[in-house]
A protein has these predicted regions:
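N-terminal flexible/basic segments that precede or flank functional cores
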Residues: 1-44
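Alpha-solenoid HEAT/Armadillo repeat architecture
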Residues: 18, 34, 50, 73-76
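Extended, folded domain segments that form the structural surfaces/walls around functional sites
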Residues: 27-28, 33, 68-70, 78
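Short alpha-helical DNA-recognition segment
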Residues: 50-70
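Short, basic-rich loop-to-helix N-cap that marks the start of a DNA-contacting helix
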Residues: 75-88
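Short C-terminal boundary/hinge segments that cap the last helix of small helical domains
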Residues: 91-101
Length: 101
């Protein structure tokens, strides 16, 4: 018997619920960075900021909570200095490594 599931009845997925420790956060960001998509990176940083508490991350980054939400939308292209401030506030850093040939 095939049971059809109404997609609209499924709960929304929220990655922030699964980002409880540094190792998970690092793995998540590493995977996101491989996509080479600024909007996806912004959204991922937003997920992590929500997991850690948006207000405290905004305060640590030196920007308003509203500006942080705006900068970390999936349709945004955040400036590097904003990404860097948010990463510092989150306790992570972006690392450069050679591209394997």
């Amino acid at each position: 018997m095939n049971t059809k599931v109404d997609i609209d009845s499924l709960p929304d997925f929220d990655a922030a619920q699964y980002l409880g420790d540094e190792a998970t956060i690092a793995a998540y960001l590493t995977d996101i960075l491989q996509a080479n998509d600024a909007g996806l990176l912004a959204a991922a940083l937003g997920d992590i900021a929500r997991a850690r508490g948006m207000s405290s991350i905004a305060e640590s980054a030196g920007i308003t909570r509203e500006a942080l939400y705006k900068a970390l939308r999936a349709d945004s292209a955040p400036r590097f200095d904003t990404v860097n401030k948010v990463c510092t506030a989150l306790g992570v850093r972006l690392v450069v490594e050679p591209i394997a040939a």
